[in-house]
């Protein structure tokens, strides 16, 4: 299969703003792809060489070295490449222009013919894999030579998307949900197969692996798919409410209640003597927690399992829980073994999804928890999450206050009926989080995605000083604007923000972004931030839940304030539009709705 095919489709995808058109075009590309390398094609579409959970290195080519590779490939002076880049702001477009110029001025371009062999997807994939995996002395020069070799063979359009791929900036607007829908259309006979494909992906979060199974065994093979140790399961997510009485009613009157820990959620896989740890974002974080690997090996029973818990920093003297920030301090230390001494951790387990070749995601919580409790040996490091079974408001409140007093964020209230399965990749009312109220009318913080930026005035003139934030709509796989946040940033954070945003700047709005507001710059929906505000209000300026509460208006956050970046969350993990609507419906209503506030004022 020629790489040119992918490049031509990327060129078309980049110009589309409709998700339906995006999905249809992507389905067309998949159906025309070589089935033998369909997994590689899918990874390239995702802008990666392999799934994040494998923990393999990324390409590791910086701007400076890309400029050098383009210079070598196009026989152009490095300064000229750099000046053109400063003028255009897109290295991929720089490569395309220089390759076009090279072709038109060469003798082959004059004759209107070419003798070079076409660039194959396999060659691109294997060469870029070498670039990523090459280490040691002289590795930088080798990486540049390998990349320059590919760019020499590439035509202008191929060069454009090769460079963007290496930069990690494909800009074609494709999310995992769009790829899933396209796979259902291309290989499953239509959109009706989407649920089957999505379920498989939720159990094995590897789109390339799912695509390979479909083309080799057919869509029916996905119906019996089980979790596989080494491939993370997409985590089950909780809804949120701030009223204990309403929570208990939602889960059927009785529930299992766990502490909600202020730590890092971890999915732990074991097969024989191999142990893997995956983050909430399904990244391989095993190397960050050699102590946890040791604890799981020593204090759990079973040859093969997938379990879930929270890694929490604890005081080395008292054993009391420390905050999430302490865990972040540990991660920043270069000497991991020194970090283990300074910031020890405990693991609090709360679920079991797979054990000895049996899929437990379809079994009720009580069955899963009972088995989980039976495989943990008595010890001081790996424990079952603090929990209680409740059937009345008083016990729920009492346990909630106890959790807060012991350093927790609140509690997770979990349904215990026969239908209380593990809903991989889904957010539902089987789990509901109850967190302490903030000193604000909003009952909880929200996690929103940056989709644009606005330049400041006065001392902040010339700098991006406020952000257009969006909530995630999983039904449409889009990001709907919900507020413009300008407060809460330190000067240092603002300086860091300029670089962050310029790296993901776009010329036009991302096709997955739904916004009436026009920021000064559009960006890729990559970064997630935790935001607090005074209340959720109706606003004609924003598209979150457009026309749901009031015609021609959406929902917005009044007086939003930045709290922190949520690097542990992907854009699709952000607060959903339905959650924003739920929070709006649950907040105390005034007799007259406050008039919409323009956050830019």
Swiss-Prot record:
**Keyword flag Nuclease:** no
Q: Which Gene3D superfamilies match?
A: DNA ligase, ATP-dependent, N-terminal domain (1.10.3260.10), DNA ligase/mRNA capping enzyme (3.30.470.30), Nucleic acid-binding proteins (2.40.50.140)
A GO molecular function assigned to this protein is: DNA binding
Q: What broad class of enzyme is this? A: ligase
Which InterPro entries does the record match to this protein? ATP-dep_DNA_ligase, DNA_ligae_ATP-dep_bac/arc, DNA_ligase_ATP-dep, DNA_ligase_ATP-dep_C, DNA_ligase_ATP-dep_cent, DNA_ligase_ATP-dep_CS, DNA_ligase_ATP-dep_N, DNA_ligase_N_sf
Identify the EC number(s).
6.5.1.1
> Could you confirm whether the keyword Repeat appears in this record?
no
GO biological process terms, semicolon-separated: cell division; DNA biosynthetic process; DNA recombination; DNA repair; lagging strand elongation
**Cited Pfam families:** DNA_ligase_A_C, DNA_ligase_A_M, DNA_ligase_A_N
Residues that coordinate or bind ATP: 258, 265, 280, 310, 350, 427, 433
Record keywords: ATP-binding, Cell cycle, Cell division, DNA damage, DNA recombination, DNA repair, DNA replication, Ligase, Magnesium, Metal-binding, Nucleotide-binding
Please name every pair of cysteines joined by a disulfide bond in this record: none
Q: Which residues form the active site?
A: 260 (n6-amp-lysine intermediate)
Q: Which cofactor does it need?
A: Mg(2+)
Give the residue ranges for region: Disordered: 568-601
Swiss-Prot/TrEMBL catalytic activity: ATP + (deoxyribonucleotide)n-3'-hydroxyl + 5'-phospho-(deoxyribonucleotide)m = (deoxyribonucleotide)n+m + AMP + diphosphate
Instruction: Please name the PROSITE patterns in this protein's record.
Output: DNA_LIGASE_A1 (PS00697), DNA_LIGASE_A2 (PS00333), DNA_LIGASE_A3 (PS50160)
Q: Which family does it belong to?
A: Belongs to the ATP-dependent DNA ligase family.
Q: What does this protein do?
A: DNA ligase that seals nicks in double-stranded DNA during DNA replication, DNA recombination and DNA repair.
Query: Which protein is depicted?
Result: DNA ligase
Originating organism = Saccharolobus islandicus (strain Y.G.57.14 / Yellowstone #1)
